[in-house]
From Swiss-Prot:
It holds the Pfam family Mur_ligase_M. This is UDP-N-acetylmuramoylalanine--D-glutamate ligase. Pathway: Cell wall biogenesis; peptidoglycan biosynthesis. Belongs to the MurCDEF family. Cell wall formation. Catalyzes the addition of glutamate to the nucleotide precursor UDP-N-acetylmuramoyl-L-alanine (UMA).
Amino acid sequence: MNVLTNFPYQHVLVLGLAKSGTAAANVLLQNHIQVTINDGMATLEDATVQKLQTMGAELVLGSHPISVLDGKDLIVKNPGIRYDNVIVEEAQRRGIPVISEVELVHYLTNQPVIGITGSNGKTTTTTLITEMLDRSNVSVKVAGNIGVVATEVASSLQSDEKMVMELSSFQLQGIDQLQFSTAVLLNLFEAHLDYHGSFENYVEAKCNIFKSQNKHDYLIYNADDDNVSAAIKTAEATKVPFSSSRPLADGAWMDDDFLYYKDEKIIAIRDIVLVGKHNMENILAAIATAKLNGATNEGIVQVLTTFSGVKHRLEFVGVINGRYIYNDSKATNILATKKALAAFNKNVVLLAGGLDRGNTFEELIPYLHHVKAMVVFGETAGKLKDAGVAANIPVIEKALDVQHAVEVAFALTDEQDTILLSPACASWDQYKTFEERGDMFIQALHRLK
């Protein structure tokens, strides 16, 4: 196990357990740091809490008294707890540093750490980079907002291994010294404003991914995104751009037929399994990152000719009875469904609907021109039907749920057509999670084989 090195704190408050708080408390206790755990929901009946108490943690459960800050010199905050929380605000007033669990990686390993962030595409890009390195026989472990908690991975990282981390703005706001050997900034648009308070604060949190980098590190960035280009001006790292719109002498780019890294042709677009312009951007970022970290062209091509997407994110399910099936259940908002529709150019049957958050769907209308039929379901079925009528879609059917929508869609399609589940809505009117909705979609498909 790797130990905390040059860790200057003696008595740490872990605020909020869940996965990241539990992992942080474990690492701190194993390194003989005094730990107090404060969680409003956990109880002494919880086996995890009992284990941490046995290891020596002091427990303050069920409430958040200000007194938990007394004698503490560091707060490790669960990413889900906002900075306007009364404990966090008081800690900052007292000058006590507040970090997220991922910052502990700085004290646990000197191995290269690759960090990926952005408003969209993080999981797909992180997965692509990890797979490209693995197929190129580069030892790598994935962590962060995807996979295993970062401190758990860093604690066991070997001297020949690299670490790849997906990072949210919540996590990045709580880092200070963690240095990424390669940082990836995919895109920036308004998101999580309820948490950060403003777009400027959100961008500032995202930019923490490169604030500790120096000229020996790499910053992979989207040269087509004006917000990104403005944000990285102060970065000290060696900047490596990617673009889906123009050639680049010093980065990853594409034309109508091929993807390139600098002047090197990597792969024909027709050979790539993933679809969609947004996925081409993710792939370009992954290629640049992988090449800089030892990936071979052979390894990169192996991944791109077989990788069908992260589950529920415009995932290619397969060809069933001649129909091409895509599961984009993660599309819980209109923007995501617009991007999914833009990935196809003809003969799409769209399955959409879900929780009604008060949205109208006029924004979708320009993206429905190649949709031959819609199957709508859930609370928003009526609103989506109105959008379909406005787009002159010839056939619009209403289904009871996703499973029923699959049956209806097959009756409306011919061989070579595409069936796309991209709901444009959250799932909570009928399903617990978007994952459950996607799984029900796939199960219904398999029953038709």
